From Swiss-Prot:
<feature type="compositionally biased region" description="Basic and acidic residues">
    <location>
        <begin position="122"/>
        <end position="135"/>
    </location>
</feature>
<feature type="region of interest" description="Disordered">
    <location>
        <begin position="122"/>
        <end position="150"/>
    </location>
</feature>
<protein>
    <recommendedName>
        <fullName>Uncharacterized protein in sph 3'region</fullName>
    </recommendedName>
</protein>
Length: 196
């Protein structure tokens, strides 16, 4: 923010006065802190760990043009803290390669600069849902359930001796038997035999 920068530079000059060594150190830290180009989205992920009271204290001091050495030293300490946090954040930042779609958008934007026409960006691809890991048993059951196997009219004998007749369909490890317009689900572990 240019207005904040101007306010801070003006305040640095007033606070340090004739103390050239302190002014040089303050300027060096301020220039280093303010020259980092980091996107706002990065700070939304890794915010500066500067407490609200310290941030308020810094800007309150700068706005009030306090000239004492105590506030100058306090501001220097806060700026050094910000500097260290930025250095740490930048060193941890991972570069993401630009894909072709983004490069085309950037080229389009650069060609449109200065024109009053609205910039048309490519449609952003839908975010892919993360792939969930499933056990092979679950996957096989689901894929079989999606594709039922029609067996036709069958006679099913259960392990308890019951005999059932009707139109049978297999869904993984389950069988559905339609008998007199009623559906009955039978687990394969309960079936003794299936005959034509």
């Amino acid at each position: 923010d240019p207005q904040k920068e101007e306010l801070i530079e003006h305040s640095l000059n007033k606070q340090t006065g004739s103390n050239f060594g302190q002014k040089t150190e303050l300027e060096k830290v301020w220039v280093d802190t303010s020259s980092e180009d980091i996107s706002n989205s990065y700070f939304e992920i890794k915010p500066l760990n500067l407490s609200g009271s310290r941030e308020k204290s810094l800007f309150k001091t700068l706005k009030e043009d306090r000239l004492d050495a105590k506030s100058a030293q306090e501001n220097l300490n806060i700026l050094k803290e910000i500097q260290q946090q930025i250095i740490k954040n930048v060193s941890q930042k991972k570069q993401a390669p630009l894909n072709e779609l983004y490069l085309k958008d950037l080229e389009n934007i650069s060609n449109q600069l200065g024109n009053s026409e609205p910039i048309k960006l490519s449609e952003i691809e839908k975010k892919q849902e993360p792939i969930e890991r499933k056990t092979s048993t679950t996957t096989n059951t689901e894929s079989n359930q999606e594709k039922p196997l029609r067996l036709g009219n069958k006679t099913i004998q259960l392990k308890d001796g019951t005999i059932l007749k009707g139109n049978a369909m297999q869904y993984g490890s389950q069988y559905i038997l339609e008998e007199n317009e009623k559906k009955r689900i039978i687990e394969s572990t309960n079936i003794e035999s299936i005959s034509f």
